[in-house]
Amino acid sequence: MNISMRYFSILVVVSFSIFSFKYGFWSEASEASDSKIDTRAVSVLKGTITHVRDGDTFEINGIPVRISALDCAENSTPEGKKITRFTKKFQGKQAVCELTGAKTYDRVVGYCSIAGKDFAQTMMNETSCKLWAKYDVWDRY
């Protein structure tokens, strides 16, 4: 390979690399989201509680929401099962969640209310769920 062909090859590789980065061929932002909508652009999520996973996670119109600042026993424990049964009373109800912008696993994180009442506060008052102050990012409790 002569020198001019070598320089031409290097020029092509460098040009392609710059073009690829500039136009996002290798960008992580282009990966598909697991949710039905891009929740990063949503500050308030309103809808019906369509599924209850446990005491601190439910789905609104199929979008999983982790309740901010709330710590409930896991479903694998007797107390967790009791809390989940209590939480299922809210299935089918309308909820309004202010999303914090955080995401954990497949869930968006938010402070939610049902019928104008703070859901986390209700859970702390009515069940053995506790405040998880580390995740009370807006200092609500």
Where are these regions (language model features)?
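Small beta-barrel nucleic-acid-binding modules, primarily SNase/OB-fold domains
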Residues: 2-141
